[in-house]
Amino acid sequence: MPRTRNIGALCTLPEDTTHSGRPRRGVQRSYISRMAEPAPANMNDPLLLPLRMNTPGLSLVQILLGYMSWLTYLACFLRTQTQQVFLNTCRCKLFCQKVMEKMGLLVLCVFGFWMFSMHLPSKVEVWQDDSINGPLQSLRMYQEKVRHHTGEIQDLRGSMNQLIAKLQKMEAISDEQKMAQKIMKMIQGDYIEKPDFALKSIGASIDFEHTSATYNHDKARSYWNWIRLWNYAQPPDVILEPNVTPGNCWAFASDRGQVTIRLAQKVYLSNITLQHIPKTISLSGSPDTAPKDIVIYGLESLPREEVFLGAFQFQPENVIQMFQLQNLPPRSFAAVKVKISSNWGNPRFTCMYRVRVHGSVTPPKDSHLEPLS
């Protein structure tokens, strides 16, 4: 086939009278002819690219423009060859022509992207000047400071947690101290806010004629060369003093006894308080020497008449117990007798630590008695 032959003549197909009743339009043939005109004269010669790829000194934009020009010529060549091959045997020339155009554009885009990606540098190098180095150095220093301050904050947080733990321990110790002070107040009886008319320091005393004998045990005596020197047993008036410590008590034999207390002055009686040490500080560890069943009598000076005021039971679990008198006659008394009927299990002796008597020197408000002269 001669090289100068028109491509339009080669691609002309006989008219298909079976599918359409009219011949193909000449516009399509002329359009195909125009598309084939830019083809080179000699198709077998190698293609000569308009740009040199490895020319030194060219920028990236110039290289890309050269690649695009080369790809454009390559796409035109491929499209022309494809049209010559397929359009001579294809009846749907217009459809095939559009398909070839789309395929050519797609191939062009894919090939261009591939070439662009192949010639991109594997690592982008950033040229830094003095205007960039300064802020970057400042940023690094700021990061180091932030990291350092973060460590300091964590250390401060740990120290704060330790301080909180110490404060909690101090609060616990303070609570324990408050509890100990409360216990001491309970032992000393400071929480009972009533006047004690049986207190020795204000004039109260013991009527020894109407009081049981003191219990004398061999261990409460001291001997030197088998000669008795001193009896360490406490007298009955120890129950009128506020010093309540282990051993500082009045003991009488067996589980029955009594003590008569002369009050500092005549009193309209209302309450009586008994106190004993807790078993936790007792040397024996048992409250068996504490009194149990108690009867209270009021005594007048002349004549000495006993008036029943009440009967109670002392519980050793509560070291201080205040009892409300059951019988409150409308008169005053100069003395009080405390009668012990039993203790909490010790058959040899019973201990009494402190007895307090409460009331008022004036008649109660609900009575219509005359004040004492």
UniProtKB/Swiss-Prot annotation:
Tissue: Testis-specific, abundantly expressed in spermatocytes and round spermatids.
Domain SUN: 204-362
Effect noted on mutating M160K: Increases interaction with DNAJB13. Impairs nuclear inner membrane location, expressed in the cytosol with some protein aggregation near the nuclear envelope
Topology of this chain in the membrane: Single-pass membrane protein
Residues in compartment: Nuclear: 1-103
Keywords: Coiled coil, Differentiation, Glycoprotein, Golgi apparatus, Membrane, Nucleus, Spermatogenesis, Transmembrane, Transmembrane helix
Pfam families: Sad1_UNC (PF07738)
Localization: Nucleus inner membrane; Golgi apparatus
Effect in UniProt of substituting N346I: Impairs nuclear inner membrane location and increases interaction with DNAJB13
Any one GO BP annotation for this protein: protein-containing complex assembly
Superkingdom of this protein's organism: Eukaryota
GO cellular component, one term: nuclear inner membrane
Protein name: SUN domain-containing protein 5
Species in which this protein is naturally found: Mus musculus
